[in-house]
């Protein structure tokens, strides 16, 4: 059971104030707005829910695997899976997004001296680290429960998508909060699915999201944009 210290650590990691630059990315949502795939509250909620399904199929179960390897000191396995995840990002801006956010969180872990020397040294030795790998390292360093940690990861992703929708569509603040509240159950389902996939032998990781890849590629040359992805 998560105690007060662990809960505080989770709230810290999931906070929009975490200095990783998440606010500057929309992960294709802005391109979806540009082509009118997302145009109002209902379509924004549907888009985010579909994106959460994609997250539950790859990034969230990978987070659980990375967390376990960080805790066990299997740093070679962490590096191998991290390289695989980066290779699955289909566009340049998606690769830059996860690399920049991972670098920023890695730097914060070093500055805050989270975790033991071995974990921080392994992170420092990485030429590049993706965001799920860095977030899993931070969660392991702060000794949070893995299920709670991946829940925080998924919720933070949903919250960032909601904030992007409020700016890009645009939507009112109340609409954004309705979207966020309406996706509470979807976050819980995503955690269940991620846990199931991570427990399979071999793990069931699926990166199939052709629509996201196409929209992200379009966004790279979009005439006017607010976000970096």
From Swiss-Prot:
GO terms of molecular function: nickel cation binding
Alphabetized Pfam families for the sequence: UreF
Entry keyword annotation includes Aminoacyl-tRNA synthetase: no
Disulfide bonds: none
Domain of life: Bacteria
Keywords recorded for this protein, A-Z: Chaperone, Cytoplasm, Nickel insertion
Location(s) in or outside the cell: Cytoplasm
Cellular component per GO, a single term: cytoplasm
Stated family: Belongs to the UreF family.
Role description: Required for maturation of urease via the functional incorporation of the urease nickel metallocenter.
Oligomeric and partner information: UreD, UreF and UreG form a complex that acts as a GTP-hydrolysis-dependent molecular chaperone, activating the urease apoprotein by helping to assemble the nickel containing metallocenter of UreC. The UreE protein probably delivers the nickel.
Protein name: Urease accessory protein UreF
Organism: Ralstonia pickettii (strain 12J)
């Amino acid at each position: 059971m998560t105690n007060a210290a662990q809960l505080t650590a989770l709230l810290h990691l999931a906070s929009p104030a975490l200095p990783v630059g998440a606010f500057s990315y929309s992960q294709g949502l802005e391109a979806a707005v540009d082509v009118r795939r997302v145009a109002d509250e209902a379509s924004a909620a549907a888009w985010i829910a579909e994106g959460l399904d994609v997250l539950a199929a790859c990034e969230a179960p990978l987070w659980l695997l990375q967390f376990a390897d960080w805790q066990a000191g299997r740093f070679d396995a962490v590096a191998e899976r991290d390289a695989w995840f980066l290779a699955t990002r289909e566009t340049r801006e998606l690769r830059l997004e996860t690399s920049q956010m991972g670098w920023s969180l890695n730097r914060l872990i070093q500055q805050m001296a989270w975790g033991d020397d071995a974990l921080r040294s392994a992170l420092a030795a990485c030429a590049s680290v993706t965001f799920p790998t860095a977030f899993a390292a931070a969660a392991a360093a702060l000794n949070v429960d893995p299920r709670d940690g991946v829940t925080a990861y998924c919720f933070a992703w949903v919250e960032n998508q909601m904030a992007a929708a409020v700016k890009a569509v645009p939507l009112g603040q109340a609409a954004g909060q309705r979207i966020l509240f309406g996706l509470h159950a979807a976050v819980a389902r995503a955690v269940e699915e991620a846990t199931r996939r991570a427990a399979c032998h071999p793990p069931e990781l699926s990166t199939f999201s052709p629509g996201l890849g196409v929209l992200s590629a379009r966004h790279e040359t979009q005439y006017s944009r607010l976000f970096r992805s």
